[in-house]
From Swiss-Prot:
GO terms for cellular component: endoplasmic reticulum membrane. The gene is algn-12. The chain crosses the membrane at residues 1-21, 60-80, 86-106, 133-153, 172-192, 198-218, 259-279, 284-304, 309-329, 339-359. Belongs to the glycosyltransferase 22 family. One of its GO terms (molecular function) is dolichyl-P-Man:Man(7)GlcNAc(2)-PP-dolichol alpha-1,6-mannosyltransferase. This is Dol-P-Man:Man(7)GlcNAc(2)-PP-Dol alpha-1,6-mannosyltransferase. It is found in: Endoplasmic reticulum membrane. Its main location: endoplasmic reticulum.
Amino acid sequence: MEGTEWIVIIVTIIHIILAPGTKVEESFNVQATHDLMFHLPTNLSNYDHSQFPGVVPRTFIGPISLAILSSPMSFIFRFWAIPKMWQLLLIRATLGLMNAMAFLYFARSVNRKFGRETAMYLRLIMCTQFHYIFYMSRPLPNTFALILVMIVFERLLEGRYESAVRYATASVILFRCELVLLYGPIFLGYMISGRLKVFGFDGAIAIGVRIAAMCLAVSIPIDSYFWGRPLWPEGEVMFFNVVENRSHEYGTQPFLWYFYSALPRCLLTTTLLVPLGLLVDRRLPQIVLPSVIFIFLYSFLPHKELRFIIYVLPIFCLSAAVFCARMLINRHKSFFRMILFFGVILHLLANVLCTGMFLLVASKNYPGFDALNYLQFQNRFDAKKPVTVYIDNACAQTGVNRFLHINDAWTYNKTENLKPADLENFDFLVLGTYGNTLKTEVESKFVTWHRPLFFVNSFHQYKIKKSRQFPWIYPEIIYTEKAVVLKNRNYK
């Protein structure tokens, strides 16, 4: 492996270590992986999804794969009695490294197609941007699909179009049905140009049908067993989002939000270099245009999240990397080109500064995770006592998962909508808020039977501050108390 390839691996691990928590959108895959690792598949009543099924079901294919790949190290962890919280880092590292290797696989095809310098800059650019590396280890359906998407891009660059159809079909059927919006424009172009055959046994349609049938033959029996009813998860997701059009229940954004907000935040200062790459290499427009069309088509869905378009970030960065490589190669030909080359270096440094701030914020954005961890650390000598802990919905959504239930003698309760009077017998309460009213709520509802043990500060917002001294303008990160642990007054 080359030096910049190792940088991708190292940066991925750094992100995992500094921001180990998970949030509500990752909940199903995290909990399912935990249950597969610690419970027999014949004992589904102990599985988290049996108690908290969520709005739409998700496939178990991803968690099963993650549990199997993590099992050798998991066995070692258990043999040495290492707390299972560390196995959360293990599964995230496993997923992150799978995505890192898929990206490096794609980067090597860029090396063969565009040159060594372009591949080097592609890896460096991706390492200096926060969101792609951050999401690579997040147990999300998008992240499992991302592995296959990178393989699809690699196969397309190598001219292995039929193989690309196979991986594309699998990613759509198993993980993210909306990826058809990405693959449609891509494969349509290859079909029109005659590089991808449409009909016949080896045509795109026949290959897609065969792979879809194979994926359904795997997904439906497995997921039907775990969910206890006949089920194709992505089919239900598609019905929920497209037919019922209920995704707006999770919030909406303006039509162009991906273009003016999400992409600039993902690409950071690299945004300025993407169009320049399109100007210096005629091959790039046909590669980049389908990604633009994908984002445009996806914009019709009212509910928007940055992670929904994470797949196409390497394509935009490829365009920027081509420009950076040209500046590196031609830097000695003129003074102007030397200036542009230094601009390329400065843009990487600017990305690193922004990513450092994002990573700092992310490390303090999981109050539920921090609260339960510190509670268990403070009471580590009571690990074998029958302690009861109540975890409210806000903390459950901001980091608490079954990997954090490290004391077998403790009872962790996440029952929703309990009244304050129902909580008086719990030894500890782990409570959170999404606003700034935590202390007020504690003082008005819970002080009769419990007293605050400690509060957890978490990221609230950032502001742009102005100063008369250098650097004149800088971001200020503001933290507020987002979680509290209360201790029963009768607990000894």
